Amino acid sequence: HWREGNKAGLGAGGADLLLLTEEPNLKRYRGTTGLYHFAIVFPNRRELARAVARLFVLKDRNHPTDHIMTKTTYLDDPEGNGIELYCESPEDGTFIIENDDFVTRRADGSWSDGREPLDVEALFSHLKEDDRLDDLLPAETRVGHVHLHVRNVQEAVDFYHGIIGFDVMGLSSTFQAAFLSAGGYHHPLGLNA
């Protein structure tokens, strides 16, 4: 972590995961194009459990959600920037596009919309008695993906796929979203209208 003038870098013991620049005279407009949220991926459920437990202890408003293929919680920073904290859980299921919508299939074959409340007690069962909630993020923590608000999902897909070269992992006009990939990861870039 470092701070110099109006800039700061945040990380997990290695390279910076996030660079911040303070611009005190700028006004924030919600719902415009730009950042929707960025996501921090934890190496395992135990580390995510520590992060979520810390939010609970600090009474920081967050929204634990079970996307089946990931366990996650959402929160906003003081300026309203969306943040997702998550860990992968592919053993629980996967997502597909069906009838122009994103759906998830659990490992047992049952279907879900992937937006269920997270069972936080089950998540907290991964904590150990000596886990400290005030420890820094583990070094394996990284930025998992970024979601952008876009004016038109198809135009954005045409650009990021056709010009930049991302793979299209899924596109839903019903949900007004797209998941784009590089190297097979489910979506280092998400697009939402």
Residues of each region from the PLM?
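Conserved small-residue-rich
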Residues: D135-F179
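Extracellular structured ligand-interaction cores
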Residues: G5, L35-H37, T70-T72, G82, ...
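Short secondary-structure boundary segments
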Residues: D16-R61, T65, W111-E129
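Glycine-rich loops and low-complexity Gly/Arg-rich segments
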Residues: P43-R46, N62-D66, C87-P90, N99-D100, ...
